[in-house]
A protein has these predicted regions:
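Secretory/organelle targeting and membrane-embedding segments
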Residues: 1-187
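A short, hydrophobic C-terminal helix/tail in secreted or cell-surface proteins
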Residues: 188-193
Length: 193
């Protein structure tokens, strides 16, 4: 990680080789309501992964009448990628028609990221929170009802896990987690790079 050789969790001193302490989770979540029906949400987080990044990837559905559907080329998904950490920015990944005769396409990326000058003048997230705290502004803080709902969700998952003998696949430090977690993602996109 960052050019250094590091141990995975189970290789650490004072950690049992058969430890089942949760250090990684990957999942496909769905929300059972009208607005989000049929929209999968994928999450992946863990210790000692390839990189520390936080991003939201919106993968657009294919339209039924796609002009470029019947080509020999396998088209990439159209994506909106919102990078939250470490490099704030946004990019739109599209299949664009090549500027030639025919219907061939090529992947293009439209990106925006803050300039180095803007980054230098931007306060850290914690600075904003501390300032809000001093002002008594609770807008950006988690309220009890939100926290309670979050724990209700997490507790339901934890309860299911305790009912089954754990068989967690291990993973090497500096990777994106176990191979099994990558199988959740059904199409190639920047999120797996």
């Amino acid at each position: 990680i960052d050019g250094k050789q590091v141990k995975s969790y189970r290789e650490e001193d004072r950690v049992a080789k058969d430890s089942v302490t949760p250090t990684f989770v990957s999942g496909k979540l769905t929300i059972d309501n009208f607005r989000w029906a049929g929209v999968p949400f994928y999450i992946r987080t863990g210790k000692r992964m390839k990189s520390k990044t936080i991003q939201v990837v919106v993968e657009f559905k294919e339209v039924p009448m796609n002009l470029y559907y019947e080509t020999d080329n396998l088209l990439d998904s159209n994506l909106l990628v919102i990078n939250i950490q470490p490099n704030e920015g946004i990019s739109l990944h599209l299949n664009a028609k090549k500027n030639i005769q025919g219907i061939d396409t090529e992947p293009v990326q439209l990106s925006y990221a803050m300039s180095a000058q803007d980054k230098m003048n931007t306060v850290d997230a914690y600075e904003n929170l501390l300032f809000d705290c001093l002002k008594g502004d609770a807008t950006n803080f988690t309220h009890w009802e939100e926290l309670k709902s979050t724990w209700k969700f997490v507790d339901a998952i934890q309860d299911q896990w305790t009912m089954v003998e754990p068989c967690f696949p291990n993973y090497e430090a500096g990777t994106n987690g176990p191979l099994e977690s990558c199988l959740l993602y059904t199409s190639p996109s920047p999120r797996d790079s």
